[in-house]
Amino acid sequence: FSYNALANGDYNTICDSFFSSHYVFNVFTQKASTALKYNYKKMNVSIGMGASQTNFSQKDLFTNTTRTRSFNNLFPKASFTYTMQGHSRFVLRYSGATSQPTIDQIQPLNQNTDPLNIVIGNADLKQSFNNNYSLNFNDYKMLTGVWKYAGINYIQTNDGISTSDSVTAAGRRFSKYVNVDGNYFANFWGGMGRKIDRLNLTLGFNLNGAVNNRNNFV
């Protein structure tokens, strides 16, 4: 409950209907998954799928209103591994996952814990979906002590959850949760080296990098 201050420093005994709420939340989740694996000579293939359903029930005892949301979540995954001669391996993986909004993000509340920065929930938020791709290569020559590796990972998000901000002439910022496209993250890594037995020394180098893009509205 939120109460407004009076001119004499006391607080009004009547709740501020814009900022007040009394919520009861119930969350129910059920999950299931399956996978298929196939091995043939130097190849290993795996395909799987998981699914879950999450149900939200939000009852505002202050306004005597009830909101319900149901999210169906899918978790596809696949991998391909090819083992070459010696200790060389090539691995390609994909996984997908939905992510439902949190209670704070979908509840239609106006939060005034910080009077200059007001956060508003969005009951119409969609769940986001992440596509995760990765490619890895590893090689090690036991006799010569030479090793090398490289990899890249890329995550792309559909209907990502972000914020839309607006600022009033008085300097108050209002932030509302919204869905956006165009969010992604990518990183890469690699290295190589060898062991010099007669010097009891290992020489090598490594490199890595990353790029991240996250959209919001102002």
Can you describe what each PLM-predicted range is?
Residues 1-218:
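Exposed, low-structure sequence patches enriched in small/polar residues
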